[in-house]
Amino acid sequence: MKSLVLGLLVGSAIASGPLQHVLHAPPDPEPKPEPEPQVVKDPFEELRDTFDRLRNKAGDIWDDVMDNIPNIMSNMRPLTIPAKKFTRRPDSEWTHIVRGADLEALWVDDESGYKHRKIDGKLSQYDLRIKAVDPSDLGIDKVKQYSGYLDDNANDKHLFFWFFESRNDPFGDPVVLWLNGGPGCSSLTGMFFELGPASIDENITANYNPYSWNSNSSIIFLDQPVNVGYSYSSQAVSDTVTAAKDVYALLTLFFTQFRQYSAQDFHIAGESYAGHYIPVFASEILHHNNTNINLQSVLIGNGLTDPLSQYPFYRPMACGDGGYPSVLDSQSCQSMDNALPRCLSMIKSCYDIESTFTCLPASIYCNNALIGPYQKTGRNPYDVRTNCTGNDLCYPQLNYITEYLNKPHVMRSLGVEVDSYESCNMDINRNFLFHGDWMKPYHRLVPSLLARIPVLIYAGDADFICNWLGNKAWTEALEYPGHAKFAEAPMENLTMINSQGKNEVFGEVKSHSNLTFMRIFKAGHMTPFDSPQASLEFANSWLSGEWSEV
């Protein structure tokens, strides 16, 4: 990110110079006095002045943080992430191995006779090791399954994935990449807790999920960035842009091995911090002209995408204006109101400069001032209707999942190479935060996506942490050609035939110019967990092309 920041600073210095206007001379001009000698300022001096102004601005922001949260430095921990213990499995244990170097070496002729790479991207450092998983071994689902690792051999990074074919028509149904957020939480959590083929009960037993999203699509569950879930590395990833290169490589090598899926529609879906990931990952894919990834849309659930538009809605959601009773007392609500202007000023500084020195203070101050009061109540930040129980993530089911995925038999069946599994790696969470990634304006990538593919933003309306009010606000504020018509579009009912055979309104939707927003009633942060039938209903409708305009 240093080169990006430097580019912005240099741009600021150049833009600060005076503009020259050429005017027609008036008739019969008066004699002009001799001009004063013009002092031409050294451009490097202008650049130094710009750095000084930015340094002073960053210093003021840090002073604000230290004044308001004086113990913050004592809570900071080193950014190093302990390496996981692992045992590399021999190549003979893998069903397929795809070499990125082999793919990068392929050249083809275009219609004009010019040679170009068959597949774009720097792939030579990557391999994909794939294991065919015996469906009867774990009893998760009867469909064809694959697991394995993407290896970045140049940087000692190894990303784990688990793939399930569609229960319906695997050679006709779309393929979906699912990403959990955090940052630092395993997508296997989403698989077993929300939308995958099975859940894990208190007896640490797998139970069939009739509302799995692989009912009508094939799904790749990916543990990313490295050191999340079953993934591992001696290196650390601390920002979303770096992670995008790995995801592009994995998908490219996967579709190279499984050509039967590469012609089918492909979609990226995820929740929470995937509101950061998905715009970047989709942009990385669409950046390449010669690719075997047939990206058709993206879906972001209860995401964090545009903090400047979303953070003003923490107070309304916590204080009774989001459709549920207030969680906080009037004094706490007023405190959040008082803190908001300073918070927004800090986020704007982050947006303007996009450096750690402005984005990190914004994260620290705003999260303490606007999320902290809610967390102190003991209520579930992922569902305002409940208290937080079971563990730090408020759901005891996550403990069952962790215990299941640490079983030696499970790890052996999947070809896992690490010694243990954890659902969320808080060191990674802290690393992204301390590198300023949390507050960065990744929503600015969405307009270019909308020019090529549909984008769905959905939100369970009982979530606090990435609430529906904020998600609706940022979509309505997004600057793109369809902005005005989307903002004024009315909300319409979402309906389905429920399990009792009755017509049920489960949410509301607005859509225009490839952008769609959905509010899902009576669902929290993990929408498919709270509303499994409704989630499958809107997912199937979306993947089949409803609300798409491109």
Swiss-Prot record:
Disulfide bond entries: C185-C424, C319-C333, C343-C366, C350-C359, C388-C394
Active site per UniProt: S272, D463, H525
Cellular compartment(s): Vacuole
Lineage: superkingdom: Eukaryota
Residues that make up the propeptide removed upon maturation: 19-131
InterPro entries given in the database record: AB_hydrolase_fold (IPR029058), Peptidase_S10 (IPR001563), Propeptide_carboxypepY (IPR008442), Ser_caboxypep_ser_AS (IPR018202)
Example of a GO MF term: serine-type carboxypeptidase activity
Main localization of the protein described in the UniProt heading: other
Entry function: Vacuolar carboxypeptidase involved in degradation of small peptides. Digests preferentially peptides containing an aliphatic or hydrophobic residue in P1' position, as well as methionine, leucine or phenylalanine in P1 position of ester substrate.
Family: Belongs to the peptidase S10 family.
PANTHER family: SERINE CARBOXYPEPTIDASE CTSA-4.1, SERINE PROTEASE FAMILY S10 SERINE CARBOXYPEPTIDASE
Listed name of the protein: Carboxypeptidase Y homolog A
Organism: Paracoccidioides brasiliensis (strain Pb18)
Gene: CPYA
